[in-house]
C-alpha cells in the first residue's frame, strides 16, 4: 500500500472511531426528543407546544455548557496528545467548578420563576401554565447535567469515546422508558402527563451522574481529585478562560439569536409552534453525524497539535472540511427521502400545521450542508487550535446584524407568511460561509497551546 493511502486509511480509522460512537449518542438524544414529542403529542397539541417552548431554557443552559465543553476539549485534547495526564485532571476540575455553578443558577431560576421564563417565549396563558409546571420539576436536572456533561467530555478526549457513549446512551434509554411509564401511566405507574416527562428527565440525569462517578473510580489515568477542585490550577484556568471566553460569548450570541427564532415563531400562532417543534426534532436527528463530526474534528486535530504535529494537523484539517461537505449532502438527502414518513407521524397536527411542517422539512434538507461544514470548521478545527475569536465575530455579526433583523421585519412589519419567515431564519448557516472560508486559509488555528502554559500570567 502506498504511504499516502496508508495515511488516509489511518485518518479515516481514527476519525470514525471517534465520530461513530458520538453520532450514535447524538441520534439517541434526538430520538429521545422525538419520543417526547410523539408521546406528548398523543396527549394534546398544547402539551407538545408547551414543552417545546420550555425546552428553550434547556437550550440556553446547553449553550453555556457547550462553551465549557468546547473549552475543555480545546485544552484536554492537546494535553492528552502531549501525554500530560496531570494537566487533563486539573482542566477537568477547573471546568467542573464552573459548570456546577451554572447548573445551580439554572436550577434556581427554573424552580422559582418558571412563569416569567415561559412569558419570554409565548403570551399564551395555557402554554405558560403547562410549561411552568414542567420547568419546576425538571429544574434539578440542570444540577446533574452541569456535572455529568463535563465528565463525559473528558472521557471523549482521553480515549474513552465508546464508554462515554454507552453511559450517555444508558441515560437516554432510561429517560425514554420512564417517559412512557410516567406520561401514560403504564404498568401501574401514575399517569402524570407533562409532569411525568419532567420527572423522567431528572431521574435519567441523576443516573448519568452515578455512571460517571463509577467511571472516575475505574479509570486510573485521569481521576477527579477533590484537592484539584478546592485549589485549581491558575495557569490552566487562565488558559481556559482565554480560549473559552470567546466561545461562551459566541454561544450566547448565536444561541440568543436562535432563541429569538423561537420567540418569532411563538408569536405566529400555535400551529407554527407545533410544526417548528417537530421540524427542529427532525433537523436534530438528521444532523447527528454532522454534529459528531464537528466534535471528532476538534479532538483529532487537537491531539495532533498538542503532540507538535502541526503539518499533519493542517493536512487533516483539510480532509475534515471535505468530509463535512459530503456529510451534509448525504444527511440532507436522507432527510428528503424520509420526509413523507415524518409527515405520516404528524397526523395529530392541524391541517395548517402539517402544511408548515412539510415546507420546513424541505428547508432542513439543504440546511444540513451549512450545518455540517460550519460545525466542523468553526466549532471543530478552529477551536482545536484555540482560534475562537473568529467564531464570535462571525456569528454575532451574521446573527444580529442580518438574520434576526430580517426575521423580525418579515414577521412583524411585512407580515409575511410562516414559510417565508422560516426560510429567512434558516439562512444563517450559509451567509457566514464566505468569511469562514477566507479565515480558514489564514491557518491561525495551527497552534500548539501546550507550549503557551504559564505565558497567560505574563
Residue map of PLM features:
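Interfacial/gating helices of multi-pass transporter permease domains
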Residues: 40-59, 125-130, 194-195, 236-243, ...
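Transmembrane helical elements of multi-pass membrane transporters/channels
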Residues: 17-36, 137, 171, 204-208, ...
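N-terminal transmembrane alpha-helices
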Residues: 6-38, 42-43, 56-71, 75, ...
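Short alpha-helical transmembrane segments in multi-pass integral membrane proteins
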Residues: 1-19, 76-141, 190-245, 301-367, ...
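Small-residue-rich hydrophobic transmembrane alpha-helices
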Residues: 48-108, 145-164, 262, 275-339, ...
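Short runs within selected transmembrane alpha-helices of multi-pass transporters and secretion channels
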Residues: 69, 138-157, 164-175, 197-212, ...
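Helix-terminus/linker motif at the lipid-water interface of multi-pass membrane proteins
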Residues: 27, 31-49, 118-125, 181-192, ...
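Generic alpha-helical transmembrane segments of integral inner-membrane proteins
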Residues: 23, 27, 31, 35, ...
Amino acid at each position: 500500500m502506498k504511504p499516502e493511502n496508508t495515511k488516509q486509511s489511518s485518518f479515516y480509522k481514527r476519525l470514525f472511531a471517534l465520530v461513530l460512537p458520538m453520532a450514535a449518542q447524538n441520534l439517541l438524544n434526538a430520538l429521545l426528543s422525538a419520543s417526547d414529542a410523539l408521546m406528548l403529542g398523543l396527549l394534546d397539541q398544547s402539551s407538545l407546544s408547551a414543552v417545546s417552548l420550555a425546552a428553550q431554557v434547556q437550550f440556553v443552559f446547553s449553550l453555556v455548557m457547550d462553551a465549557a465543553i468546547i473549552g475543555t476539549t480545546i485544552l484536554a485534547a492537546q494535553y492528552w496528545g502531549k501525554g500530560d495526564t496531570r494537566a487533563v485532571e486539573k482542566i477537568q476540575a477547573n471546568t467542573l467548578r464552573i459548570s456546577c455553578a451554572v447548573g445551580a443558577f439554572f436550577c434556581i431560576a427554573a424552580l422559582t420563576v418558571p412563569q416569567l421564563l415561559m412569558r419570554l417565549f409565548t403570551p399564551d396563558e395555557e402554554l405558560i401554565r403547562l410549561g411552568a409546571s414542567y420547568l419546576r420539576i425538571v429544574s434539578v436536572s440542570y444540577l446533574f447535567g452541569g456535572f455529568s456533561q463535563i465528565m463525559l467530555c473528558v472521557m471523549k478526549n482521553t480515549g474513552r469515546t465508546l464508554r462515554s457513549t454507552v453511559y450517555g446512551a444508558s441515560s437516554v434509554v432510561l429517560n425514554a422508558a420512564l417517559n412512557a411509564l410516567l406520561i401514560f401511566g403504564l404498568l401501574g405507574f401514575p399517569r402524570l402527563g407533562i409532569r411525568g416527562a419532567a420527572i423522567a428527565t431528572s431521574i435519567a440525569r441523576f443516573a448519568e451522574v452515578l455512571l460517571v462517578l463509577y467511571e472516575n473510580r475505574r479509570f486510573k489515568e485521569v481521576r477527579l481529585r477533590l484537592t484539584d477542585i478546592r485549589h485549581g490550577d491558575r495557569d490552566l484556568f487562565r488558559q481556559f478562560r482565554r480560549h473559552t471566553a470567546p466561545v461562551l460569548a459566541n454561544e450566547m450570541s448565536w444561541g440568543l439569536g436562535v432563541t429569538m427564532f423561537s420567540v418569532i415563531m411563538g408569536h405566529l400562532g400555535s400551529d407554527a409552534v407545533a410544526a417548528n417543534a417537530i421540524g427542529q426534532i427532525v433537523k436534530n436527528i438528521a444532523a447527528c453525524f454532522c454534529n459528531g463530526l464537528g466534535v471528532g474534528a476538534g479532538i483529532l486535530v487537537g491531539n495532533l497539535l498538542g503532540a507538535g504535529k502541526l503539518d499533519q494537523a493542517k493536512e487533516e484539517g483539510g480532509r475534515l472540511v471535505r468530509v463535512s461537505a459530503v456529510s451534509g449532502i448525504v444527511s440532507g438527502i436522507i432527510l428528503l427521502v424520509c420526509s413523507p414518513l415524518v409527515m405520516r407521524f404528524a397526523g395529530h397536527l392541524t391541517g395548517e400545521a402539517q402544511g408548515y411542517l412539510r415546507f420546513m422539512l424541505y428547508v432542513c434538507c439543504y440546511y444540513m450542508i451549512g450545518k455540517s461544514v460550519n460545525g466542523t470548521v468553526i466549532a471543530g478545527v478552529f477551536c482545536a487550535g484555540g482560534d475562537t475569536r473568529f467564531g464570535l465575530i462571525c456569528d454575532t455579526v451574521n446573527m444580529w446584524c442580518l438574520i434576526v433583523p430580517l426575521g423580525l421585519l418579515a414577521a412583524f412589519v411585512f407580515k409575511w407568511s410562516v414559510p417565508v419567515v422560516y426560510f429567512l431564519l434558516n439562512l444563517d448557516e450559509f451567509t457566514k460561509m464566505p468569511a469562514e472560508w477566507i479565515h480558514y486559509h489564514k491557518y491561525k488555528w495551527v497552534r500548539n497551546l501546550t507550549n503557551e502554559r504559564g505565558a497567560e500570567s505574563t
